[in-house]
Design a protein with these regions (language model features):
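Active-site-adjacent structural segments surrounding the nucleophilic cysteine of cysteine proteases
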Residues: 2-4, 15-79, 124-127, 142, ...
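Stable alpha-helical elements in mature extracytoplasmic
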Residues: 37, 42-49, 66, 70, ...
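Noncatalytic regulatory segments and standalone regulatory/sensor domains
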Residues: 22, 77, 113, 121, ...
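Extracytoplasmic glycan-interaction modules
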Residues: 22, 73, 84-85, 94
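Sec-dependent N-terminal signal peptides
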Residues: 6-12
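Active-site-adjacent substructure of cysteine-protease-like catalytic cores
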Residues: 97, 101-149, 185
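A generic structural signal for short, solvent-exposed coil/turn residues
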Residues: 13-18, 90, 112, 128, ...
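Sec/Tat-exported extracytoplasmic proteins
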Residues: 45, 49-57, 74, 78, ...
């Protein structure tokens, strides 16, 4: 009887160890959704990221998180949108550190696991010149899916990894990480 209880206890501990060692199937962040204005995917994406960090840090969203105001400030008619460099400058002016880089699947997963949403530039099929910005908020490695806050469509839009990578590779996998500057940083 005593050995049966010990054996049962060992099985429970082993089972818990196995369960807790497994990584979650889907990693996603609850990033607020902002619907874009016409040709305003960049400004909506900026607003979503700022609102996410404001929520994480427990602070009121500032004026800098208003997509309409961002659009008025940064929109370039000849570009049909916002330049990537202007997005970075906007974040920096609002006390964010920015890192633009050529992303890949592994980097997306790493940043999301650390609680960092990413803005990605896509060139959807059929678009001749303009880019489309989305916020990558989750990945499901088992199903090869991404979860996007697509300002033109909806929150938590599921997209197949292969479709995403095709549209992303047309922009050389342009990715933007914006994180708040540490307190006292400047």
């Amino acid at each position: 009887m005593f050995y049966s209880l010990i054996r049962a206890g060992v099985l429970v501990v082993c089972a818990f160890g196995i369960v807790s060692a497994q990584e979650p199937t889907v990693a996603w962040l609850d990033v607020p959704f902002v619907k874009q204005l016409e040709k305003g995917c960049g400004s909506a994406s900026i607003a979503m990221v700022i609102q996410y960090w404001d929520k994480q840090l427990g602070r009121q969203s500032e004026d800098g998180a208003d997509a309409e105001q961002i659009q008025k400030e940064l929109y370039v008619p000849g570009a049909d949108g916002i330049y990537a460099s202007a997005m970075e400058e906007y974040f920096q002016e609002h006390q964010f550190l920015t890192f633009s880089f050529r992303g890949d699947w592994k980097l997306l997963q790493q940043h999301l696991k650390k609680g960092r949403p990413l803005i990605a530039a896509l060139k959807p099929s059929g678009m001749t010149s303009s880019l489309h910005y989305v916020v990558v908020v989750g990945v499901d490695p088992k199903q090869d899916l991404l979860l996007l806050n697509d300002p033109a469509r909806r929150k938590l839009l599921k997209q197949d990894r292969s479709d995403f990578e095709k549209e992303w590779s047309a922009t050389d996998n342009w990715t933007l990480l914006a994180v708040p500057q540490p307190e006292g940083g400047g």
